[in-house]
Amino acid sequence: MARNPVHTMLASPNHDELARQQYTLSLKDYVRDHVRARNEDLYEYRAKPRFVKEHGREPESVQEIGTVMWDDPAYQMFSRMHRDGQEMMWASVADTLYREQDRLSADYTKFTQSSHCKGTLELDPDFDMPRAMADVDIHLQPGGYCSDYGDDDVLAGAFYEYGGNLYTMGRGVGVSESKGEVGVRFLKERYPDFTPTRILDIGCSAGSSTVPYVTAFSDADVHGIDVAASILRYAHARAEAMGKGVHFHQRDAANTGFEDKSFDLVMSHNAMHEFSQSTTEDMMRENFRLLKPGGVAMHMDVN
């Protein structure tokens, strides 16, 4: 499968939008490869000696390193360029998504109200959104993950996938495989006889890491949970557009509400770095509660 598969729910840039996105990607690449790469030398030859001169010892914590680095104009310049690049990336993506917003909402309705739906969507109108998710525009995504503008709104999910594709392209992540496909390959190599019949993807976001498990384990009942309604609507429509049946639910990773010992495979893909320490611990306990005897928990992340 292509690393970023083309499907009807994926926004399509016009010529000028694509040119702006490619420029932004080049800028972010330059900052990463040529500006950020000098931070180690900046610390060793300027920031650390300045700290030693003032305190008579080397920095002993991340906080002390941060303090002395933040005082350096070169690091301030890098930080400004790094944030500007991220803001420019989202602005370039927004041009395409706001132009396509009505079309995406209409396609969401078309796919999810079809008599040929393979999966389902369960949203909770009384869901108590975690403040850590609702009060912050995570990764500077406009509106954050939890923005919701109505019953047919899929904008947060569209931002997540389209912006994420551009971001990971610049970092060389998953050039030939998606996170989900890497997870499938790991399972097949590590547990060649493992054939899960019920699978749960925690923090499934737009469903791009969930769908590969439907392809790999065609007889499995695949579920995905997340807290954000707009992202889940997008995930549902995306899966249906690709002809894949996934059951999406608006639920909390720390308290999923599923029955004990009800899944063979419980997993997540780059979700835990968005969780608090307490949520991560609760999620791990929930894993053990949900797993059938002989089941597998698999979590990949950057932290």
Briefly describe each language-model feature range:
Residues G294-D301:
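Conserved beta-strand signature within the Rossmann-like core of class I S-adenosyl-L-methionine
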Residues T195-S205:
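Conserved class I S-adenosyl-L-methionine
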Residues P5-R20, T24, K28, E60-D151:
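N-terminal auxiliary segments of SAM/dcSAM-dependent transferases
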Residues V173-T195:
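Conserved alpha-helix/loop element of class I SAM-dependent methyltransferases that forms part
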Residues A254-V266:
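A short acidic, Gly/Pro-enriched loop at the edge of an enzyme's catalytic core
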Residues E281-P293:
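A short glycine-rich, Lys/Arg-flanked "PGG" loop and its adjoining helix->strand segment in the class I
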Residues L265-S278:
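A short SAM/SAH-binding and catalytic strip from SAM-dependent methyltransferases
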Residues L200, T210-N255:
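Class I SAM-dependent methyltransferase SAM/SAH-binding core
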